[in-house]
């Protein structure tokens, strides 16, 4: 296999926290029964993109679930949680036009990424570092590196299949951005150990990597069978589209997963970061985060309208890439109420009512 170089991550600028604060947010609200209910903004309403679904998803998702269950050696509780996750459905909506082979790789990776997220939540810094070494060595040295860890064996399976058709530049971006993800969750683990809540600007930069979205966006190229030139992906407008998509997905996730995460005492979430940085209560912070989601959609539309031309052939590929980003935005917003990850089986009901009762703090399960 060819070598893969590593380059440092370029951080996108983020705006001062208080400059983003909507003028109508109330800084302090009275405590009482109202404080025990979390009200969500309608995140889907501001997204102008149609929801699409890959026609192969039903059987591909079933095959992928069986593969992960076989490799992961779940307990019964973990198995039920994994099935309720329904990661395959998210893939079917994010990668709506690819063939079954590419969709299977995407499904396997998406389920793998969600498991990494859960495993890293349970690890300290040393455990997370060991996880990183096993996975990244598998990607850098697929022909020679050997590890019996579940993470490495699972990664080797989908990676060897992906290598059959992935373009060299897309491959580079995939590996590089997964490396960014691991570096970021190491920082997240360190913050958890020290009980540190970062300020808003620091968190936004970190969250763009802990989300795993950057690697998911590389899969857009793989799924479409394209390999965009580096100068296209590195263009400021394309980067602005990537950041806007990442922010929209990450912040929607933070809003809708906040109740579950606060019940575990997990503070790597936009809501507590806003509460601390801006000095407002949890409901005001949720409203604030919803406003940021709406702004990220607006920024995406502005960037799309300003795209330059790179010539007919590349422009067609860019159009496919941007379509994939749009699919990611709407798919994540809708899927969040279809999965059992955040609301159990109550997702459809909460999708209509847009509110939940505040859960008690019980710690990590």
UniProtKB/Swiss-Prot annotation:
UniProt keyword annotations, A-Z: Lyase, Magnesium, Metal-binding
Single GO term (MF): metal ion binding
Binding-site residues for (2E,6E)-farnesyl diphosphate, renumbered to this chain: 341-342
Annotated residues for binding of Mg(2+) 2: 117
Pfam families registered for this protein in UniProt: Terpene_syn_C_2
InterPro entries named among the record's database cross-references: Isoprenoid_synthase_dom_sf, Terpene_cyclase-like_2
Position of sequence motif NSE/DTE motif: 253-261
Essential cofactor(s): Mg(2+)
Substrates-to-products reaction catalysed: (2E,6E)-farnesyl diphosphate = delta-cadinene + diphosphate
Binding site for Mg(2+) 3: 253, 257, 261
Gene Ontology annotations of biological process type: isoprenoid biosynthetic process
Protein EC: 4.2.3.-
Site features described as Plays a critical role in the stabilization of intermediate cation, chain residue numbers: 114
Motif DDXXD motif in this chain: 117-121
Domain of life: Eukaryota
Role summary: Terpene cyclase that catalyzes the cyclization of farnesyl diphosphate (FPP) to various sesquiterpenes, including beta-elemene gamma-cadinene, delta-cadinene, and alpha-cadinene.
Family: Belongs to the terpene synthase family.
Protein name: Sesquiterpene synthase 3
Species this protein is from: Postia placenta (strain ATCC 44394 / Madison 698-R)
Lineage, top ranks: Eukaryota, Fungi, Dikarya, Basidiomycota, Agaricomycotina
Gene name per UniProt: STS-03
């Amino acid at each position: 296999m060819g070598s893969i170089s590593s380059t440092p991550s370029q951080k996108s600028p983020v705006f001062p926290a208080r400059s983003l604060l909507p003028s109508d947010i109330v800084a302090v609200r009275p405590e009482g029964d109202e404080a025990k209910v979390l009200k969500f903004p309608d995140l889907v309403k501001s997204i102008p993109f149609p929801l699409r679904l890959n026609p192969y998803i039903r059987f591909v998702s079933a095959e992928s679930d069986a593969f992960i269950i076989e490799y992961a050696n779940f307990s019964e509780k973990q198995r039920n949680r994994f099935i309720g996750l329904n990661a395959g459905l998210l893939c079917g909506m994010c990668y709506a036009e690819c063939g079954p082979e590419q969709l299977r790789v995407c499904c396997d990776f998406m389920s793998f990424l969600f498991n990494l997220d859960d495993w890293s939540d349970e690890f300290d810094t040393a455990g997370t570092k060991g996880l990183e070494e096993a996975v990244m060595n598998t990607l850098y040295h697929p022909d020679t590196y050997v590890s019996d860890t579940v993470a490495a064996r699972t990664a080797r399976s989908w990676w060897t299949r992906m290598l059959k058709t992935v373009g060299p530049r897309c491959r580079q971006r995939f590996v590089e951005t997964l490396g960014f993800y691991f570096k970021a969750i190491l920082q997240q683990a360190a913050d958890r150990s020290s009980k540190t809540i970062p300020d808003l600007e620091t968190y936004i930069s970190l969250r763009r990597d802990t989300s795993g979205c950057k690697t998911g966006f590389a899969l857009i190229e793989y799924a479409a069978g394209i390999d965009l030139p580096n100068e296209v992906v590195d263009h400021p407008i394309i980067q602005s589209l990537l950041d806007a998509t990442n922010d929209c997905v990450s912040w929607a996730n933070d809003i809708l997963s906040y109740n579950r995460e606060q019940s575990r005492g997990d503070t790597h979430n936009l809501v507590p970061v806003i509460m601390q940085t801006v000095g407002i209560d949890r409901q005001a912070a949720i409203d604030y985060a919803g406003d940021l989601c709406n702004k990220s959609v607006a920024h995406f539309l502005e960037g799309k309208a300003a795209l330059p031309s790179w010539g007919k052939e590349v422009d067609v590929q860019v159009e496919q890439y941007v379509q994939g980003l749009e699919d990611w935005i709407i798919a994540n917003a809708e899927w969040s109420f279809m999965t059992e990850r955040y609301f159990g089986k109550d997702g459809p009901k909460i999708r209509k009512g847009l509110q939940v009762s505040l859960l008690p703090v019980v710690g990590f399960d």
